[in-house]
Every structure is written in C-alpha cells, then in structure tokens.
Design a protein with these regions (language model features):
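TPR alpha-solenoid repeat register
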Residues: 24, 58-60, 94, 128, ...
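Terminal, low-structured helical/coil segments at or just beyond the last alpha-helical repeat
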Residues: 122-174
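Structural marker of alpha-solenoid helical repeat scaffolds
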Residues: 17-18, 51-53, 86-87, 120-122, ...
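Register position in tetratricopeptide repeats
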Residues: 1, 34-35, 51, 67-71, ...
Length: 174
C-alpha cells in the first residue's frame, strides 16, 4: 500500500511535465482506477484518447473499459472494449473482457463467441477456461464443459480456477 501511495506523485509529475504523454496518462489512469478513484482515472484515459498523437488508442480504450468494469458499468465497459476491437479485431485481452461483459449480462451465446475468438488467438488462461466452463454449463453443452474442464485441469492443475472448477462441477452434478 505504501508503495502505491508513493507512486502517485511520480504519475502526477509525468502527466504535468508532458501533457501529451498519453502513455503516462494510461498508466496514471490505471493506477487511479485500481485505487477506486474512477472519475479521475477515466479523465486520464479520456485525455489520452483525445491526444492526436496517441498511436495506441486501444490501450487507452482497454484501460477505460477495465475502469468501468470495476464499478460494474457493463454498457460503458462494452463500448470501450468494442472500440479497441475495431482497431484490433484479434486483441486477446479485449476479446476476453467482452466475454466477461457478455457473461455478466447472461448473454451466453455471445460469451461463447467471444471466448472462441479469444482462444483462436492462441491465448489461454485459467480464468478464461473457467469462464468457458461456467458459460457452457449455463448453455447445458456438456461436451464443451468437459472440453474446457479438461484443458483447465491439464494446463493449470494447481490454479485456484481449477479448484473453483472442481467445486462448480461437483455442485452441477448434484
């Protein structure tokens, strides 16, 4: 906690020293959002997005979307993640975030589609596989539940997600 608090003056100095430093604004925005200062964080991301020299808009869009996720504002989160995907349709992190947004809205077919696109990029994580298991359970697609569950057990056997999945599967079979 003290390291985080000590970092803030450096972030502030970086954006004050160079107002056009969109990378510093993205970093500061992420720091502020993770600190629960959502409005201030979003202001940093929006400033970075307005910068005509920002050649990595998708980073600012991902950051703003993630900031909205922390306050469960799925509509705004989705808007920013979709903007990131316009410029980079195979951006794995945006695809995964869109799957989480769709799942939170109980849109399980869309969740499946975004996860499939995510996996097609070659990306994979314990969290994404657990989300796939949870989603396919909702769709009652037992073959896909087993496929993702087996991948989770094989690739991430010691993860907390593998433990969560085991409990989830046990209750699903009750």
């Amino acid at each position: 906690v003290s390291d985080r608090a000590a970092a803030e003056p450096y972030f502030a100095q970086a954006v004050d020293t160079d107002n056009d430093n969109f990378s510093a604004r993205n970093d500061f925005g992420g720091y502020l959002c993770q600190s629960g200062r959502i409005e201030e964080g979003l202001a940093q991301f929006n400033s970075a997005l307005r910068n005509p020299y920002n050649d990595a808009l998708y980073i600012s869009q991902l950051g703003a979307g993630a900031c909205y996720v922390t306050v469960l504002n799925w509509k705004e989160a989705e808007r920013y993640f979709l903007l990131a995907l316009v410029g980079r349709p195979k951006l794995a992190l945006a695809l995964y975030h869109m799957a989480k947004v769709a799942f939170s809205q109980a849109d399980h077919l869309r969740t499946r589609a975004y996860l499939q696109r995510f996996f097609d990029t070659g990306a994979e994580s314990a969290a994404s596989l657990l989300l796939a298991v949870r989603n396919e359970l909702k769709l009652k697609a037992s073959d896909l539940v087993l496929l993702h569950a087996n991948r989770l057990r094989a690739e991430f056997p010691e993860s907390s997600e593998a433990s969560d999945m085991a409990r989830l599967m046990a209750t699903a079979n009750d």
